[in-house]
């Protein structure tokens, strides 16, 4: 038998050889277990029009060869092993992976006629790995492969071992005697296997008695000759260092002499030092062009002479108030000409200014003022009240606030105070950015640093005396500072629009002010049309990632400039975009500084050209550091590393800034931006750039030659017609359809656009989606993947995206499901009750009725406790008795039909409660409530106790005003009737007391809920982000904002719902939105009182017996352990992980699976089988009539204990956890403070530091109004423990988000736990009848106690 083998790069047939060794496939399966794909990245910025094979020599000189021979004789490590390890090291630094693999082709020892064997070489590397151990492992693995020389890594074997068909794109060919220390002569040139077109890079090596030779073969479309030479030199350096260093991998320097020389040439000139101060440069302009316009604002104009006069007067006044060097002065202004006066006045006084955005929360502004130790603040009259709350001493500046223009207010004794002339090393300004802990982080920029950026910036942007610069950016961003000071230094005019113009009339403002230059984010630039801003000559884009359309839209209309910088180092690089072909991910050489690329884990090592590393900036342009944060400053603003001192001299002391950006040098020394170090790059808002999704899908989907992603509305969508992201994946076929029929979209060619679904394609979809979750936000991961035979084209030979949208939109549900794994036949329901339940199942699970069978398992088909409640509600409406526990006990449709009971259910309803009947002394309480709410007594509708959940949430907010407040943005259709919408919300608020609820404090009852008769609060604004919402005692907990920011239109385009978590949970919002829709369409609403649930909570027994029994003899330490008993966890790191969970065998709720999987994970990492943690429950299983319709939050936090028997079945453990959960339903609402008081063991259980929150998948909205593209889940607002785990269900995916305190749990530990959790969860689904012991290898320290406990 002959087996044809295809190499993994492009699938062309290569070799035929016998495959008769049984052990071969087993060997490869074992060897490749856990292996990740390793792809060498293309270093080309622009691919040439033609491609051909090429090669460069790798110099293995006589001295290195003699060292290799000596090393081999001494250690027994072959030359081939050293070559393999060296190439593994090269792959590591170019891919950033510690685990790498590549093709391994070795000519058998029989000579030139021997058959080549294609395999894989895996190399596990890390900085701490011992070199000798690495070499020994590689050699041992190679020996095992040589034992089965005729069994290659065929596609069949590879497909069994790896989910991805593209495992590697580089290969090494070893010929001659390099495989063993003893020599076997063979000639490199005689080995002609013809593999050049199979891999992007091939490294060929040959060893003879006389010496060794090597070469690197490549495709010119993949590498340039210079890049290939650099890689070859890096390989040579790796070979030399591997046999010369006896310690660890981290000690190897991969930078070749050639690369070092080139990098030093690019950065040979030290950045020039700046010797002037900003006020001096602006003063020169004021003297040389006094009548020229300096500021043209909506509230007035100032010439340079007027600006100089006003700022000088104000500066003298500030000096008398103590402003001088290193004194920071906050400025609090709306957009105004007076802001520029105040900025320049502080500079002239010798101080440093701090611009505040008054729209930001007062707490943040106060924090900034406290950080800078502000003694006084300069503010406009409009924001004087706010300023007084920030700093006690205020100087008002404005048209009617100019007492400082005369010297009358200056005390005689301070008249003699004069400021010291500023020095280049003095602080010029501080700009605050978000800190990792939520506290604003201040960056100090000195005069010298700013001056160093002046000439490079003004030259690149083209600023001069004719320039009119648009000051668009918020005062919170340093772009405003550049737009102001750079313009004044250049003699131009600063154009200041009003806030209204900024948000709703940008184009007209640009025209009205005759703006020539503007700095905008790409997002803002996208809303402008070049035809509407004809005065604009230069557009500077920065702050966000560019896409191709940003260039094509503007490059032929204006001078387009791409600015790359950071607050810590204002300008890193500036690139002029000269054409559509410009690489917008690449920036030009450094501007006013030098750019170096270092090892991300060690800034004392430079990396070779083309490898990915961290960008560090050298030069005066670098800021001073972070205000009052020496630790962070020393980690980011570092002393010159040794390699820099070698270039500049030992006494060199220039500042060096570690940017945290991952970049690589291109062949000409420019920089290509890759991403952020150790973080994921975020998109601004939730805009989906289809090109970005296409890029990632193409990288991820095996053998995809092209990808098109479109937003499609399918014909089977519910009434909401919600669109879904569809990825069209081009797959290769022998014959393409007729291009003309496909171009026009007519004829038989249309049916040939989509390929038939195959098992291989369908099985890859969940794997690809899981991989995409690692690089894209969840909303950017396509939900549907369709294979294409060819790309349809328009008459102009462009991709016919419209045709693809129509094609996907026309597919039926059955056709779409054919691209998913097939399911078995359905047994139709027989009895009347079974048919009724079939209807219920279909409605709550959103699946066609005909696809629901009598044997269907409710939880297997996607049900959970939330959908179970909806099913119960449907049964009640049809006068059938059914409980959630019935569904848990009998989840199969046929079995559930046997327990459904007919009869009236409404008779069991408790009588309605009278207002105020749940509190004593209600008259006194009503008066106190009215006083705290600052409302008349007559509007107090009811008062009743808070739930334990509400008490806890409000208490946290009283300590931190931002805690547990959600901002949910809802897009509105253009034809919305505003009056009807507001009336609808009023109707909903009248029907739902929870929306009219406030919280008050009572001496006798503690925290109480007060329902008031009032309309819901509305605000109309131009800026959703500018709205503050403060929650406190007696304050409303709900506020609605209509945001009108559509260009040229005052119609609101977005509704912002600001709401406290004490009045909603994840279940209530869809209910409220459904009511709004019904009211908008003229429907009537039934009241949704919260009192029945409050009465139930008040009547719950204390639970002493239940909780003490559940937690009896609990002695397990808290996990994770805190540094000290008094330590307060502060979640400050986030990590995400997506797990594909098969639907089969899911006989229990997702919550049950999650609890057990986490219990096993925690047991593994804690070393005990008695586990406890916290969990959030929905509370909707409570026996309260119509609880599924109530809009009061019912979630609760409870402790959960799991005692693992590692000899028991997974099924048994799942059943035990689910039974415990059901039996605990009556005691869920007691609250942690109450449970904690029940006893010593209960107190320990409530001291958990790990909290699990499982959110079931909610059904899609029923109306397009209520899509929420602007809303985000703020996990930080709800996290107070050392480990907070949030789980979201989306089909067969479980999305885990861990928010944790990295001072308690290190990043690698958290990552390890999430990976273990995912593996355990998947195994539980796949093998529910396996032993818990078999799910995960039990640590050695656990085996003793676990065995004894189990036996």
Swiss-Prot record:
Region Condensation (C) domain: start-end pairs: 941-1340
Domain of life of the organism encoding this protein: Eukaryota
Where the record annotates domain Carrier, the positions are 828-904
GO MF annotations in UniProt: ligase activity; phosphopantetheine binding; transferase activity
Family annotation (Pfam families): AMP-binding, Condensation, PP-binding
Q: In which pathway does it act?
A: Alkaloid biosynthesis; ergot alkaloid biosynthesis
- EC number annotated for this UniProt entry: 2.3.1.-
SUPFAM superfamilies hit by this protein: Acetyl-CoA synthetase-like, ACP-like, CoA-dependent acyltransferases
CDD domains attached to this UniProt entry: A_NRPS_SidN3_like, FUM14_C_NRPS-like
O-(pantetheine 4'-phosphoryl)serine carried by residues: 865
Region of interest (Adenylation (A) domain), residue spans: 285-684
List the GO cellular component terms.
cytoplasm
Induction line: Strongly expressed in planta but not expressed in axenic culture.
* Keywords for this protein: Ligase, Phosphopantetheine, Phosphoprotein, Transferase
Instruction: Provide the GO biological process annotations.
Output: amino acid activation for nonribosomal peptide biosynthetic process; indole alkaloid biosynthetic process
Q: List residues traversing the bilayer.
A: none
Name the enzyme group at the top EC level: transferase
According to its UniProt record, which protein family does this protein belong to?
A: Belongs to the NRP synthetase family.
Record function comment: D-lysergyl-peptide-synthetase subunit 2; part of the gene cluster that mediates the biosynthesis of fungal ergot alkaloid ergovaline, the predominant ergopeptine product in E.festucae var. lolii. DmaW catalyzes the first step of ergot alkaloid biosynthesis by condensing dimethylallyl diphosphate (DMAP) and tryptophan to form 4-dimethylallyl-L-tryptophan. The second step is catalyzed by the methyltransferase easF that methylates 4-dimethylallyl-L-tryptophan in the presence of S-adenosyl-L-methionine, resulting in the formation of 4-dimethylallyl-L-abrine.
Per the record, the domain comment is: NRP synthetases are composed of discrete domains (adenylation (A), thiolation (T) or peptidyl carrier protein (PCP) and condensation (C) domains) which when grouped together are referred to as a single module. Each module is responsible for the recognition (via the A domain) and incorporation of a single amino acid into the growing peptide product. Thus, an NRP synthetase is generally composed of one or more modules and can terminate in a thioesterase domain (TE) or reductase domain (R) that releases the newly synthesized peptide from the enzyme.
What is the name of the protein in this document? D-lysergyl-peptide-synthetase subunit 2
């Amino acid at each position: 038998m002959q087996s044809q083998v295809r190499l993994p790069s492009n699938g062309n047939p290569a070799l035929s050889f016998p495959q008769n060794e049984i052990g071969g496939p087993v060997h490869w399966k074992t060897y490749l277990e856990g292996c990740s794909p390793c792809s060498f990245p293309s270093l080309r910025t622009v691919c040439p029009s033609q491609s051909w094979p090429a090669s460069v020599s790798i110099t293995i000189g006589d001295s290195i060869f003699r060292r290799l021979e000596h090393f081999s004789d001494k250690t027994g490590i072959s030359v081939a092993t050293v070559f393999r390890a060296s190439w593994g090291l090269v792959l590591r630094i170019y891919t950033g992976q510690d685990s790498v693999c590549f093709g391994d082709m070795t000519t058998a020892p029989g000579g030139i006629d021997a058959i080549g064997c294609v395999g894989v070489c895996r190399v596990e590397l890390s900085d701490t790995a011992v070199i000798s151990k690495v070499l020994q492992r590689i050699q041992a693995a190679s020996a095992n492969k040589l034992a089965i020389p005729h069994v290659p890594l065929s596609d069949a074997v590879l497909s069994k071992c790896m989910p991805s068909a593209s495992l590697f794109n580089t290969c090494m060919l070893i010929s001659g005697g390099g495989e063993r220390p003893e020599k076997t002569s063979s000639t490199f040139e005689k080995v002609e296997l013809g593999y050049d077109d199979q891999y992007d890079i091939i490294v060929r090596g040959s060893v003879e008695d006389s010496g060794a030779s090597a070469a690197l073969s490549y495709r010119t479309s993949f590498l340039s000759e210079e890049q290939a030479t650099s890689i070859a030199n890096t390989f040579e350096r790796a070979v030399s260092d591997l046999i010369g260093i006896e310690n660890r991998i981290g000690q190897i320097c991969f930078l070749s002499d050639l690369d070092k020389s080139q990098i030093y040439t690019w950065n040979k000139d030290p950045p020039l030092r700046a010797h002037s101060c900003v006020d001096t440069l602006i003063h020169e302009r004021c003297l040389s062009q006094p009548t020229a316009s300096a500021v043209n604002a909506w509230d007035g104009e100032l010439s340079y002479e007027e600006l100089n006069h006003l700022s000088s007067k104000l500066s003298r006044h500030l000096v008398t108030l103590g402003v001088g060097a290193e004194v920071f002065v906050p400025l609090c202004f709306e957009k105004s000409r007076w802001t520029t006066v105040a900025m320049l006045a502080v500079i002239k006084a010798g101080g440093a200014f701090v611009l505040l955005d008054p729209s930001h929360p007062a707490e943040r502004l106060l924090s900034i003022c406290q950080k800078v130790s502000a003694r006084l603040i300069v503010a406009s009259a409009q924001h004087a009240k706010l300023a007084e709350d920030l700093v006690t001493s205020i100087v008002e500046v404005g048209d009617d606030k100019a007492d400082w223009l005369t010297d009358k207010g200056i005390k005689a004794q301070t008249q003699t105070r004069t400021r010291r002339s500023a020095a280049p090393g003095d602080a010029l300004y501080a700009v605050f950015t978000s800190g990792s802990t939520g506290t604003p982080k201040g960056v100090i920029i000195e005069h010298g640093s700013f001056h160093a950026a002046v000439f490079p910036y003004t030259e690149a942007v083209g600023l001069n005396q004719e320039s009119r610069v648009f000051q668009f950016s918020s005062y919170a961003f340093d772009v405003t500072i550049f737009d102001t000071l750079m313009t004044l230094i250049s003699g131009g005019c600063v154009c200041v629009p009003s806030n209204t113009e900024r948000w709703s009339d940008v184009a007209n403002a640009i025209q009205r002010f005759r703006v020539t230059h503007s700095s905008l984010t790409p997002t803002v630039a996208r809303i402008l049309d070049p035809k509407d801003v004809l005065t604009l000559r230069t557009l500077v884009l920065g702050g966000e990632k560019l896409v191709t359309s940003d260039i094509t839209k503007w490059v032929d209309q204006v001078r387009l400039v791409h600015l790359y910088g950071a607050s810590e180092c204002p300008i890193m690089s500036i690139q002029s975009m000269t054409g559509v072909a410009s690489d917008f991910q690449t920036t030009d050489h450094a501007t006013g500084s030098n750019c170096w690329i270092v090892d991300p884990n060690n800034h004392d090592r430079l990396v070779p050209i083309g490898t990915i590393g961290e960008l560090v900036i050298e030069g005066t342009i670098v800021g001073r550091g972070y205000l009052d944060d020496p630790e962070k400053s020393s980690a980011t603003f570092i002393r010159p590393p040794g390699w820099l001192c070698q270039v500049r001299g030992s006494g060199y002391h220039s500042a060096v800034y570690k940017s945290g950006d991952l970049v690589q040098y291109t062949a000409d020394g420019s920089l290509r931006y890759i991403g952020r170090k150790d973080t994921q790059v975020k998109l601004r808002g939730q805009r989906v750039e289809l090109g970005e999704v296409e890029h990632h899908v193409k990288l991820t989907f095996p053998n995809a030659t092209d990808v098109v992603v479109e937003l499609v509305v399918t014909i089977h969508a519910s009434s909401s017609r919600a669109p879904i992201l569809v990825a069209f994946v081009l797959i290769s076929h022998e014959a393409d359809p007729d291009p003309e029929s496909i171009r026009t979209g007519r004829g038989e060619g249309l049916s040939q656009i989509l390929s038939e679904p195959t098992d291989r394609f369908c099985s890859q979809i969940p794997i690809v989606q899981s991989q995409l979750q690692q690089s894209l936000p969840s909303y950017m991961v396509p939900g549907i993947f369709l294979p294409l035979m060819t790309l349809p084209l328009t008459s102009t030979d462009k991709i016919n995206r419209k045709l693809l949208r129509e094609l996907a939109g026309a597919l039926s549900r059955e056709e779409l499901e054919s691209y998913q794994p097939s399911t078995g036949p359905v047994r139709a329901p027989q009895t009347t009750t079974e048919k009724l339940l079939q209807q219920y199942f279909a409605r709550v699970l959103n699946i066609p009725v005909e696809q629901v069978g009598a044997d269907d398992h409710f939880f297997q088909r996607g049900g959970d406790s939330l959908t179970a409640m909806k099913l119960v509600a449907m049964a009640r409406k049809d006068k059938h008795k059914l409980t959630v526990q019935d569904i848990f006990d009998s989840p199969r449709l046929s079995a559930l039909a046997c327990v459904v009971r007919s009869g009236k259910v409404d008779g069991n309803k408790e009588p309605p409660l009278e207002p105020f009947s749940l509190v004593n002394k209600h008259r006194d309480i009503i008066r106190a409530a009215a006083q705290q709410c600052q409302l008349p007594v007559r509007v107090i509708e009811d008062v009743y106790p808070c739930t334990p959940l509400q008490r806890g949430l409000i208490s946290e907010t009283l300590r931190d005003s931002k805690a547990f407040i959600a901002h949910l943005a809802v897009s509105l259709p253009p034809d919305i009737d505003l009056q009807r919408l507001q009336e609808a919300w009023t109707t909903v608020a009248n029907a739902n007391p929870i929306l009219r609820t406030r919280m008050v404090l009572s001496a006798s009852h503690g925290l109480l809920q007060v329902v008031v008769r009032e309309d819901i609060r509305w605000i109309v604004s131009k800026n959703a982000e500018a709205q503050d919402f403060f929650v406190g005692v007696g304050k409303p907990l709900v506020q609605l904002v209509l945001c009108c920011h559509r260009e040229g239109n005052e119609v609101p385009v977005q509704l912002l719902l600001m709401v406290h978590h004490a009045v909603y949970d994840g279940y209530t919002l869809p209910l409220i939105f459904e009511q709004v829709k019904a009211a908008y369409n003229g429907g009537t609403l039934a009241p949704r009182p919260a009192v029945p649930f409050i009465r139930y909570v008040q009547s719950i027994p204390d639970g002493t017996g239940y909780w003490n029994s559940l937690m009896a003899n609990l002695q397990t330490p808290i996990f994770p352990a805190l540094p000290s008993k008094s330590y307060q966890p502060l979640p400050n790191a986030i990590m995400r992980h997506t797990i594909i969970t098969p639907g089969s065998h899911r006989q229990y709720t997702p919550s049950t699976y999650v609890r057990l999987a986490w219990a096993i994970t925690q047991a593994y990492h804690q070393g005990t089988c008695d586990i406890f943690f916290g969990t959030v429950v929905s509370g909707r299983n409570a026996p309260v009539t119509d609880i599924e319709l109530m809009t009061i939050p019912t979630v609760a936090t409870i402790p959960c204990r799991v005692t693992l028997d590692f000899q028991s079945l997974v099924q048994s453990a799942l059943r035990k956890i689910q039974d415990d959960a059901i039996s605990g339903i009556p005691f869920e609402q007691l609250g942690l403070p109450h449970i904690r008081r029940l006893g010593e063991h209960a107190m320990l259980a409530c001291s958990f530091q790990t909290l699990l929150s499982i959110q079931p998948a909610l059904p899609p909205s029923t109306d397009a109004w209520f899509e929420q593209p602007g809303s985000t889940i703020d996990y930080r607002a709800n996290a107070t423990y050392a480990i907070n785990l949030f789980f979201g269900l989306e089909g067969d995916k479980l999305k885990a988000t861990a928010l944790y305190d990295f001072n308690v749990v290190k990043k690698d530990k958290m990552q390890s736990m999430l990976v273990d959790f995912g593996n355990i969860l998947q195994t539980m689904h796949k093998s529910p009848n396996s032993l818990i012991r078999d799910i995960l290898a039990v640590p050695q320290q656990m085996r003793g106690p676990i065995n004894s406990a189990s036996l």
